[in-house]
Regions:
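Short, well-ordered loop/turn elements at secondary-structure boundaries
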Residues: 1, 24, 129-131, 178, ...
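Residues that scaffold, gate, or flank divalent-cation-dependent active/transport sites
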Residues: 1-103, 108-110, 114-117, 122-124, ...
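Flexible loop/turn segments at secondary-structure boundaries
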Residues: 37-38, 143-145, 202-203
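Flexible, active-site-adjacent loop/turn segments at secondary-structure boundaries
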Residues: 39, 48, 144, 164-172
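Generic, well-ordered alpha-helical scaffold segments in large soluble proteins
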Residues: 62, 86, 122, 126, ...
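Short, well-structured beta-strand/strand-turn elements
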Residues: 66-69, 93-96, 133-134, 190-193, ...
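Structured, non-catalytic alpha/beta "coupling" segments that mediate domain-domain communication
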Residues: 114-155
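Compact, charge-rich alpha-helical regulatory domains located at protein termini
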Residues: 150-205
Length: 205
């Protein structure tokens, strides 16, 4: 397994809670701007029925007294730089994909399962458990990403990629927006096999 993927779900929320731990039991919405409209860019897990990219004004109709924060990319970059700096001290080959995803090339140090266990423990011990890190190992970037999504917070998962079983993968592991995943689920497209069997003209409509 030559690639590790580290996912930090709700990174912006976790960063804000690192700064203001007194908000830990509150419903929090972080908003930014898309085409001059205020949209939700992250939110706490105690808020249901919304997705990233939703208009803030629409979301507020269904939530009573949430904490509303404007996204602070300067601060999030600072928090991320600390994490990446610690990883760079141990692993020289990293690829950063936004705030929530880091790929780590382990091909030159991971020879067997015992090496992988040591690498996983090293990565997870670098991070605060409050970030609920997800860690996955596989042969390539996307399969390691899927592996991470299938792991448990604070733990790691190993995925032996088999192209003959790709149809079983849930659509939630696709690197697409939450809103699009929601629409696909409403159409019954819950795994890759169902997408493959869906008529192309219907899929594009």
């Amino acid at each position: 397994m030559k690639t590790a993927c580290l996912i930090l779900p709700n990174f912006k929320i976790k960063s804000e809670l690192k700064r203001c731990p007194n908000l830990s039991n509150r419903q929090i919405l972080i908003y930014g701007f898309n085409r001059n409209k205020e949209v939700v860019v992250d939110y706490t897990n105690n808020i249901n029925g919304i997705s990233k990219g939703s208009l803030l004004k629409d979301v507020l109709l269904g939530i009573k007294d949430p904490v509303i924060l404007k996204e602070d990319d300067r601060y999030y970059s600072y928090v991320q730089d600390q994490i990446i700096g610690d990883l760079f001290k141990l692993f020289g080959r990293l690829e950063i994909n936004g705030y929530e995803c880091v790929y780590i090339d382990t091909s030159y140090i991971c020879r067997d399962a015992s090496d992988r266990l040591e690498i996983a423990n090293t990565i997870l011990n670098l991070l605060s458990k409050d970030f609920n890190p997800l860690l996955g190992f596989s042969t390539g970037k996307y399969s390691s990403y899927v592996s991470a999504l299938m792991s448990s917070p604070g733990d790691f998962n190993v995925l032996k990629f088999d192209k003959n079983r790709i149809g079983e993968f849930p659509t939630l592991v696709m690197p697409i927006s939450d809103e699009l995943k929601k629409h696909m689920h409403l159409l019954g497209l819950t795994n890759f096999e169902r997408i493959a069997n869906f008529k192309r003209e219907n899929l594009l409509s």
